[in-house]
Curated annotation (Swiss-Prot):
It comes from Burkholderia cenocepacia (strain ATCC BAA-245 / DSM 16553 / LMG 16656 / NCTC 13227 / J2315 / CF5610). Its EC number is 2.1.1.195. The keyword Repeat does not apply. InterPro entries: CbiD, CbiD_sf. SUPFAM superfamilies: CbiD-like (SSF111342). Pfam families: CbiD. This is Cobalt-precorrin-5B C(1)-methyltransferase. Transmembrane segments: none annotated. GO terms for biological process: anaerobic cobalamin biosynthetic process; methylation. Pathway: Cofactor biosynthesis; adenosylcobalamin biosynthesis; cob(II)yrinate a,c-diamide from sirohydrochlorin (anaerobic route): step 6/10. HAMAP family: CbiD. It catalyses: Co-precorrin-5B + S-adenosyl-L-methionine = Co-precorrin-6A + S-adenosyl-L-homocysteine. Signal peptide: none annotated.
Length: 362
């Protein structure tokens, strides 16, 4: 008899952040600079104390110093930088300390509101600290009293950055060097959530008091047209409604508009803060219950419960003049108001697949 036991999926692989890659390559280049020894791999210590060995693609001298590169391995996470070449060029400096520069494919900060000052290379604080710690320890080990100029680059980074939130955040010319733990956890979506927080922070720092958090391009277009908002005020939240609402607790704005497809908004209305299908589903019986509270007939309720999709349920309700879109927005609005500070004026909008408004609540 055939074994019907499903095969257990292999555990997902963790990977390493661009910050870890930058640390490994800058350490290897600096070691070559001070000792003349070129490594094939280098061990680094991550922020929580783990020691990891990272393989190098090259480690060689240059006209004014040394450089090393590694291929970014994000494990099983769908990271935009997976497979990219991350490299560091290191040169001696007379003054002690480590100074960072943006090489090809690494962006530069041009707007206030991020963790780095305007004009700085987009190398985040934890990667900077990781590199500084390793390079200062190397200098002490070899009795070197000078400092280092460290240039970090990402091959093809300028094109890859167009797939990220960097252009909207005011990071121009390439990617950011990221990471807080040094490790990429598969499908943690931490980088995306961080970009949502950064988007809100940048908007606040630039005097924007009304932001619109949108689930996708259609909802973003609807908000842009409805309010003539600048791009900086449009927050691409995707499925992470909770990331927006919770961040506003510590970084409030005067006014928040949230807009999404009817199905996504119905999940938020039911109390789900992650709107992805992996983490939440559409509750058709709940939609039917809300319709009943608005006077829907028993026949309509039964048809809605039997619907194949939320869009079908919406069309059934619309045909009977039941304002299901407004009802969903009203419930979603209450969920949001329970999270954000009372000082934030919140409103909800739902759109259909053609980008037309099908519900609103204020």
């Amino acid at each position: 008899m055939r074994d019907e036991t499903p095969e257990q999926p292999a555990p997902l692989r963790f990977g390493y952040t661009t910050g870890s890659c930058a640390t490994a390559t800058s350490l290897a280049a600096a070691r070559l600079l001070l000792t003349g020894h070129a490594d094939d791999a280098v061990e680094i210590v991550l922020p929580k104390g783990q020691r990891v060995m990272m393989r190098l693609e090259f480690c060689r001298t240059t006209a004014d110093g040394a450089e090393a590169g590694t291929i970014k391995d994000a494990g099983d996470d769908p990271d935009v930088t997976h497979g990219a070449l991350i490299f560091a060029r290191v040169a001696r400096a007379a003054a002690p300390g480590v100074r960072f520069h943006a090489g090809p494919g690494v962006g530069t900060v041009t707007r206030a509101g991020l963790t780095l000052p305007v004009g700085e290379p987009a190398i985040n604080p934890v990667p900077r600290q990781m590199m500084t710690t390793h390079l200062e320890a190397l200098a002490a080990e070899h009795g070197y009293a000078g400092g280092f100029d460290v240039t970090i680059g990402v091959e093809g980074g300028e094109a890859l950055a167009l797939k990220t939130m960097n252009p909207r955040l005011g990071i121009v010319g390439g990617l950011s060097i990221l990471g807080t733990t040094g490790i990429v956890r598969p499908f943690s979506c931490s980088a995306y959530i961080a970009s949502i927080h950064q988007g809100i922070d940048v908007a606040r720092a630039n005097g924007i008091t009304h932001i619109a958090a949108c689930t996708g391009n259609a909802s973003e277009d609807a908000m842009r047209a409805h309010y003539q908002l600048p791009d900086m005020a449009l927050i691409e939240m995707g499925d992470f409604a909770g990331a927006v609402l919770k961040h506003l607790r510590r970084a409030p704005v005067a006014r928040l508009s949230m807009c999404g497809g009817f199905g996504k908004l119905s999940k938020l209305a039911a109390g789900h803060l992650d709107l992805h299908s992996r983490h939440s589903s559409i509750d058709l019986p709940l939609l039917a219950q809300w319709a009943a509270e608005a006077g829907a007939s028993d026949a309509l309720q039964a048809a809605m419960r039997a619907a194949n999709t939320s869009q079908e349920a919406l069309k059934l309700a619309q045909a009977d003049a039941v304002p299901l879109g407004d009802l969903v927005c009203a419930h979603a609005l209450q969920v949001a108001r329970d999270i954000v500070p009372p000082s934030v004026a919140v409103e909800m909008f739902a759109i259909d697949r053609q980008g037309r408004f099908v519900g609103a609540a204020r």
